[in-house]
């Protein structure tokens, strides 16, 4: 959406061969934005379907409660060792646990203590402006024309160094800007949800 004081910025993410990369988190931050964020007004959901976390990657604002319903017929024990957002939801089916509120920004790796092949991620950001790329590697952000922003991307598959995953965008005088991230390193394989060892990015 574009308002009288805002413009849509299209963000494109492509791999080292120029192919679009889907399901990449994209978010924009203004200088000092983390100090004046309003409290989230809605919760988010990460379901458990066919022994997989759905969505595999969830992006939320700091302070957002996340529900972890279990839509499978088998029990799950959901947990994370990611500091400082550690949590444990003992074995359950259905919706037996209250939402978990994530008060700290960063990457949260999610697992199941019963099914080791289950792996999901929550990216907690100090921003109200975030989304994910579609199958064409495209995401759109509605930004204030009077502000400067740092646009960043993240995915568990990306191996490029962090310094290459953020770009500054000057909105004044640049309505309808485009930002392109051309990754230089080969992506990690997508998580297939098959049995095997887990890979934790943070403990």
Predicted regions and their residues:
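A short, solvent-exposed beta-strand micro-motif common in secreted/extracellular proteins
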Residues: 26, 65-70, 108-110, 114, ...
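A short, amphipathic beta-strand motif
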Residues: 9-15, 26, 68, 137-139
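Short, ordered, surface-exposed loop/turn motifs in non-cytosolic proteins
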Residues: 17-41, 73, 116-119, 145-147
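Structured interaction patches on ligand/partner-binding surfaces of diverse proteins
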Residues: 88-89, 93, 124-133, 157-178
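Short, acidic Ser/Thr/Gly-rich low-complexity loop/linker segments typical of extracellular
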Residues: 41-52, 59, 91, 130-136
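Short, surface-exposed beta-strand/beta-hairpin micro-motifs centered on an aromatic residue
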Residues: 97-99, 136-143
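A short, Gly/Thr-enriched small/hydrophobic beta-strand-prone motif that recurs across taxa
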Residues: 4-14, 188-192
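Beta-strand-rich domain onsets/edges
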Residues: 1-8, 104, 124, 132, ...
